[in-house]
Regions:
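Active-site neighborhood of HAD-like aspartate-dependent phosphohydrolases
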Residues: 2-53
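Asp-based, Mg2+/Mn2+-dependent phosphohydrolase catalytic module
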Residues: 2-15, 49, 128, 132-250
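Short, acidic loop-to-helix structural element flanking the phosphoryl-transfer center
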Residues: 10-13, 90-122, 128-132, 160
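Residues in soluble alpha-helical coiled-coils and helical-bundle/repeat scaffolds
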Residues: 25, 46, 72-75, 93, ...
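Short helix-capping segments at alpha-helix termini
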Residues: 39-44, 71-76, 115-116, 139-143, ...
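A metal-dependent, Asp-based hydrolase signature
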Residues: 57-94, 104-107, 112
Length: 250
């Protein structure tokens, strides 16, 4: 029989995790689709590292950034963007999940959060038509109780609505939730929602320094985030984010 005194208690009742750049490295597939789109539009190809800086605000923004890159120089009027987005979506459907990789520590971290008694949600700006197949192909689907996509709510991150919607679906007050992401969009959304937020340093963040974000800590991975949550900021594995950021051992 399990000793009730040894049943783990979650420091946070719900953990809301970003997808691209946090759970999965999806840049290889996104870049392949973006460059296939540009090729079909008879435009120059862009380096993978540059396309990575366009990720974070949804696929429409990614397409618009590709079109308006100085090396491409295509117009970004609504009709052109809509047509290019249709081309991108067709190519992305063909490659979605083929080269994407689960980051180290993700599975261990999800298991640790579960062991703590937390419920889990994905909160992403990626459309549902790409998110759900990607989660299945990567083997992550069964870990999550709720999936909030870029078209689930009226507004995307950095608006707080997707995070608040996830909390509502999980029956968890925002102040008892933890958000984990890799970008300014995650940080702004969590702050506006009143949710504790951690960031991983290996993601995309539109080319910006993760240390400049208003967050509660930087962790090396989802496994490190679970350690952070278990000790509420006293695990020595996290990095300092800013002078007023909670750091491990502080």
């Amino acid at each position: 029989m399990t000793d009730p005194l040894n049943i783990p208690t979650a420091a946070y009742r719900a953990v809301l995790i970003d997808l691209d750049g946090t759970l999965l490295d999806t840049i290889p597939d996104l870049a392949a689709a973006a460059n296939a789109m540009l090729a079909e539009l008879e435009a120059p190809q862009l380096p993978l590292a540059d396309i990575a800086t366009f990720v974070g605000k949804g696929t429409e923004n990614l397409v618009q950034r590709c079109l308006t890159d100085p090396r491409v120089g295509l117009p970004a009027d609504p009709a052109t963007v809509a047509a290019a987005l249709s081309v991108f979506n067709r190519h992305y459907h063909a490659v979605n999940g083929q080269a994407s990789q689960v980051y180290p520590g993700v599975l261990e971290g999800l298991a640790a959060f579960r062991a703590q008694g937390a419920t889990l949600a994905v909160v992403t700006n990626k459309p549902t038509e790409f998110t759900l197949p990607l989660l299945r192909r990567s083997g992550l689907s069964n870990w999550f109780d709720v999936v909030v996509c870029g078209d689930t709510c009226e507004r995307k991150k950095p608006d707080p609505l997707p995070l608040l919607h996830a909390c509502e679906q999980l029956g968890c007050p925002p102040q008892q939730a933890l958000a984990i992401g890799d970008s300014v969009n995650d940080a702004l959304a969590a702050r506006a929602a009143g949710i504790t937020v951690l960031a991983v340093p290996y993601g995309y963040n539109e080319g910006r320094d993760i240390h400049d974000l208003d967050i509660d800590g930087i962790v090396f991975g989802i496994d490190d985030a679970a350690d952070w949550a278990a000790t509420r900021g006293k695990h020595r594995g996290a990095l300092a984010a800013t002078d007023n950021t909670n750091t491990i051992g502080k």
